[in-house]
Amino acid sequence: MTMAEASSPAGDTAAGTTQSLMRVRGLQKHFGEHAVLRGIDLDIMPGDRIAILGASGSGKSTLLRCLNFMERPSAGVVELAGQAIVRAAPGKADPDRRTYDEAELTRVRQRIGMVFQQFNLFPHMTALGNVMEGLRTVRGQREAEARTRARAELARVGLADKAEAYPARLSGGQKQRVAIARALAMDPEVLLFDEPTSALDPELVGEVLRVIRSLAEEGRTMLLVTHEIGFAYHVANRVLFIAEGVIHEQGTPDQVLKNPTQPRTRAFVDRHREFDF
């Protein structure tokens, strides 16, 4: 595989379709003079389970945050279900300035769920209240309807008995499962996981990975930034290795994790040989 092939969008899909759910072309993100993303091209197909690997500072988390516009891309095109989200409007003083329709971004974020490293639960709300919040304030659902849906999502992640518990009374793994339930309640078309186990004690990692695995088995479309290489091998249908803000190599788990073609990918994988592929 050449570097050009390594950086091109993969044609293999989970659903066997050529219609992208999300399409990314030339995505860049700059913080001042520092380029974090330097031209990402990516097609996300329905049912894709994409694991994103790379060293710290490579741009993995920034990519996810640009995909749901928590960070505004500096350049490039992002499409969701064939509709462009990015609105380029070069300004006279700053030709790289980009403007966005805030109402449109709010609608987009409802369709792209995100689960963070640090849970981000409201401490003054119960687990049930945290899951209900988006349904009430964003979706405008009535309390009874939101409560029913929130309880169902908590049950899905194995926390039906913790509905009335406050975050301070939950373990890290339980907090992360509440965060996953909160994302699922909004019926996202794509789920983004930003190192969801990195803040957990080792003994709590498994309970979160089991939930993510079950979502993958349901056919959920997801992107997962993770250092759990063995988990990525068994759950993902595609693996991206990002280095210095570009997709350095991509392919199936066997291609990238067992038979990488790029020296940098190979060095990264060799550091994780203790994992059972």
Question: Could you say what each language-model-derived stretch is?
Answer:
Residues 68:
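Helix-to-loop junction immediately C-terminal to a conserved catalytic motif
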Residues 250-251:
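ABC ATPase "signature
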Residues 76-93:
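Conserved ABC transporter NBD signature motif
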Residues 125-133:
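Short coil-to-helix segment of the ABC ATPase nucleotide-binding domain corresponding to the Q-loop/switch region
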Residues 165-168, 186, 218:
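Conserved signature/switch motifs of ABC ATPase nucleotide-binding domains
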Residues 191-194:
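Catalytic Walker B motif of ABC-type/P-loop ATPase nucleotide-binding domains
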